[in-house]
Amino acid sequence: MAAKKSTPTDSGKSKGKKNKAQKGAGQKGAGQIVVATNRKARHDYHIIDTYECGVVLVGTEVKSLREGKASLVDAYATIDEGEVWLRGLHIPEYSMGHWTNHSPRRTRKLLLHRREIDSLMGKVRDGNNTLVPLQLYFVAGKLKVELALARGKQEYDKRQDIKRRTEEREITREMGRRIKGIQG
């Protein structure tokens, strides 16, 4: 009779090396180190969909990012000849690098599956959509970009969002006061 291999679902505990699903690699929030966020993007755009992309970097860029230096303020992505490119991302020169340093605002290639690129191409071409990076973070030692398919907000949309958030805040405050009034 052959011995049955133990799997994580058999007994709840597995012996030996952990696989990627157990380590939490590639999952948002599990072992991720955030380098930079684009806080203005959620204010200026309606986020339709998000994608996790890899980035092609040179060595000094990675070292500079590990120091926590990057700016997504003017960054955006384009699709040229079937490839996705990140433009306007500012990664300052590495402090310990000399003649080997990179250009801070160079165009960087994003890594996505072909079907995702084709889908994005269609969505960007059809409507008034754009590709905006929301966040830069490390997962299992590799830099990832959270890329959003987004549509620009008009000024009145921004005002409506601010008004809605203010009303929600007032409602939660009032509920808190009522609960305290009943208990206290």
From Swiss-Prot:
Entries under InterPro entries matching the protein: SmpB, SsrA-bd_prot, SsrA-bd_prot_CS
Chief subcellular location: cytoplasm
GO biological process: trans-translation
Pfam families found in the cross-reference section: SmpB
Biased composition (Polar residues): 1-11
Keyword rRNA-binding recorded: no
Free-text function comment from the UniProt entry: Required for rescue of stalled ribosomes mediated by trans-translation. Binds to transfer-messenger RNA (tmRNA), required for stable association of tmRNA with ribosomes. tmRNA and SmpB together mimic tRNA shape, replacing the anticodon stem-loop with SmpB. tmRNA is encoded by the ssrA gene; the 2 termini fold to resemble tRNA(Ala) and it encodes a 'tag peptide', a short internal open reading frame. During trans-translation Ala-aminoacylated tmRNA acts like a tRNA, entering the A-site of stalled ribosomes, displacing the stalled mRNA.
HAMAP family: SmpB
UniProt protein name: SsrA-binding protein
Organism: Corynebacterium jeikeium (strain K411)
